[in-house]
Amino acid sequence: MSEDRSAYPFSTFLDQHSGQLNASDVPPELWHSLYKKLSDQTFDAGDHFQIICEMNEDDEKTLFVRALEDLHNNDEDNIFLIDHFMSFSSESARKCVESTEGLVERLAGLFGIDTDSTEEVDETVEKIETSVEKEEAEHAKKISSETGNLPRHESVDARLSSYSVDDPKNELTEKVLKALWKYSQTYSVSYQLDNGEIEKKSVWYVMDDFGTRVRHSTEPNVRIVPLMFLPQNCAYSIMFLTKPVNTDEEIMMDWASNVITAQHPEWRKYIEQPWAAQDFSKETMIPDAPTLEYFTSGRNPDFLAGPTEQQTCQSAIFTSLPILKKRKIKVYADDTQLTEHLKNHKVEYVDDIKKADVIWMIKHFHDYKQLSEENPCGMINQFPFESCITVKDLLAACAMRDPAKNDWYQLTYNLNTQLPEFVARFQNRELNGQHNVWIVKPWNLARGMDMTVTEDLNQIIRMIETGPKIVCEYIPRPLLFPRPDNGNKVKFDLRYIVFLNGIAPVTAYVYNRFWIRFAINEFSLSNFEDVETHFTVFNYLDKEKILQMKCENFIETIEKAYPRIQWSEVQKDINLTIRKAIEAAAKEEAPRGVAPNVQSRAMYGVDIMLQHGDNDVIKSTLLEINFMPDTTRACQYYPDFADTVFETLFLDEIDPTKVTPI
């Protein structure tokens, strides 16, 4: 492409890529040489380095890379392109490996894994284009042109799999999949959705035979970082020296270099587990209590009304309530999805918070002190510091304050603050043959997004590179539902709408109707990458896979399938679980907990899963609590839903046929 450089000048390259290069700490003196090599597609690492294969006395093969000549890190030409052999997402790794003919054997050769295959594995590995790479290329174009929804991966019913661990091919597949988390790296790409929002997706990749054979060291002499080359909508890795290298010296990189290692250098031995395994099973599994900074770092503070203002507001709301019931309700709203469905109550929208009876906001509100002073009669649909309920890592911190007494939330660790304790727990369970399947969740994304179910410690450790995560014990024995449409016994979860009217004491109600989300495939504790087996929330492309069922029909089916179950008893346990969660989140003073505020009311979407407990008793487990849940289906199914919301939260009209106190 050298003749085309005039059409793509260096200045344009800098405009498009300087942000990436600076973020990766690529020395500026190397940028022009990188530009030329990318433009000309010059892969010249083979002119300066050599892949070496050594066999020990046990015929075990070791692959590494050494320099063919003296090289200096200040030489502007000493920056090298590395191609990517394959790309995948964490949930699609197995599908990519199993569905591409010959890929298992080729990856085994790339990773230096012995194979009993009679077919000779070619040591020179050509690039494999997986479905993820095709998607990646298409979506990269959409960054600058069109918008589009993210794809979801195909799924295979677990019952249709002829998988057998005794099959040599499957044994090799498992070795390759485990090795992926030693030899893969990651970057993220941004997509613009139809609604204009920007969404990030993590892409994992394996470098070509050269890059893969650069071994790990805590004293590296090169760095290898990914770069998205925008003119081609294609990702490469680039390698540059961090110190001079002598002839025949092995080149090595720090595979464990990431944000968490930089923040917690004392954790390096845990983060290095994929490359330098150690036994931590005897170390403590109990993390320290979260600090005050844990609850405040990176979050905007809420300003609380004092006791005098609270008392004034309580009196003002009590006095104004009879008047409010007789006239239009003045509403300040930044979203009208719910309020436009009010039928029994007339609304007048106002654009000044000080004039509103009800403040209904999706945007987070912070100044409760100012509200108490300027509008003591007003009520708002948020509580101060309610992130302790609605944000995954903070809810987990509240739930895990006394894990021995916690029977409503799965054992959870924050990988960004409690990684050593989690590694010890995982290895201790592995040593004792205990259930050891975990689900990795991002702190701040909707359910089903960037989640991974796995029993691979190395994979879990690597997941911290794609953003803040918690890891929860996976429910091994969920109550299953017999789907009438496909006959599968599937996982499900329940979405409840909960109204919180007060914190001290807890005053809360649950809407008497709930919604059910079903998985698609037969449940089994295998094939953890299959989203349609292990997840219940995803964006369907195939609408025929959606099973909609009203709660009355669901209860009837469950009681018929499980004659020992009385739903009324299950519902009592669910209500108790929800109350325990709210009490745990409000147990300590703000910012370590939700703060009481007489002007506050809130509606939450609470997700519950049922599982078999001791003596096969059905027990409820809380998954998460969502701020301002989507009420589209609720308003469609139940035309009086919006009125019930306002009557319960703001008008003190509690209808026991619609809601139940918890």
UniProtKB/Swiss-Prot annotation:
Keywords for this protein: ATP-binding, Nucleotide-binding
Positions that bind ATP: 472-475, 491, 493
PROSITE patterns, A to Z: TTL
Pfam families in UniProt: TTL
Domain TTL: 324-660
Domain of life, source organism: Eukaryota
Disruption phenotype: RNAi-mediated knockdown at the L1 larval stage causes a reduction in egg-laying, likely due to a defect in the egg-laying apparatus muscles and in hermaphrodite specific neurons.
SUPFAM superfamilies: Glutathione synthetase ATP-binding domain-like (SSF56059)
InterPro entries from the UniProt entry: TTL/TTLL_fam (IPR004344), TTLL12 (IPR027749)
Gene Ontology cellular component terms for the protein in this record: cytoplasm; endoplasmic reticulum; sarcomere; striated muscle dense body
UniProt-listed GO biological process terms: egg-laying behavior; protein modification process
KW ATP-binding (keyword) present: yes
Gene Ontology MF terms: ATP binding
Role noted for this protein: Regulates microtubule dynamics in uterine muscle cells.
Family designation: Belongs to the tubulin--tyrosine ligase family.
PANTHER family per the UniProt record, alphabetical: TUBULIN--TYROSINE LIGASE-LIKE PROTEIN 12
Full protein name: Tubulin--tyrosine ligase-like protein 12
Lineage start: Eukaryota, Metazoa, Ecdysozoa, Nematoda, Chromadorea
